[in-house]
Amino acid sequence: GKSTFLNFLKALFQENVTFNTNEDFRSQFNADWAGKLMIVVEEVLLNRREDSERLKNLSTAHSYKMEAKGKDRYEVQFFAKFVLCSNNENFPVYIEPEETRYWVRKISRLGKDDTSFLQKLQDEIPAFLYHLQHRNLTTKEESRMWFSPSLIRTEVLEKIIRCNRSRIELDMTELLLDIMDTMPV
């Protein structure tokens, strides 16, 4: 599942990909990942508002302060994309209702377990790269995140946003729905 997909990305983009943990993302020391093309997290749980703000900032930043332990910070170009995977469908990351920087997808399991699936994917990398180089794009740039917000507004994203509401708001919604169901109209 998640590991196979992320290992495929690593095989595809090689040294331009780094695996991070939630703690790596929260650390002030970022020299090992700030210069990468892709930052992947296998079991993401970044459900604090400050995590969300940092992700939002980084997803549109053109430059970023890189910092290594015991060294001065310095500014670098920042162009990384984040791939965050999780089995937690309700609350893997805090997402505000009008947010347009996340494209959340639910990926179904394969029909059967195939222990050589990663190797099969890796064997197809040359053909896959050829396809990417020679295909026509089907979308035009429509926003700062390229895609139209309506294209990336998925049911799974909506579910996460609903689960991100405060406990009081969720309880009030449930109470009002119960009242509406029991009242004769």
For the regions a protein language model found, what residue spans apply to each?
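Feature primarily recognizes SF3-like P-loop helicase cores of small DNA viruses
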Residues: 4-185
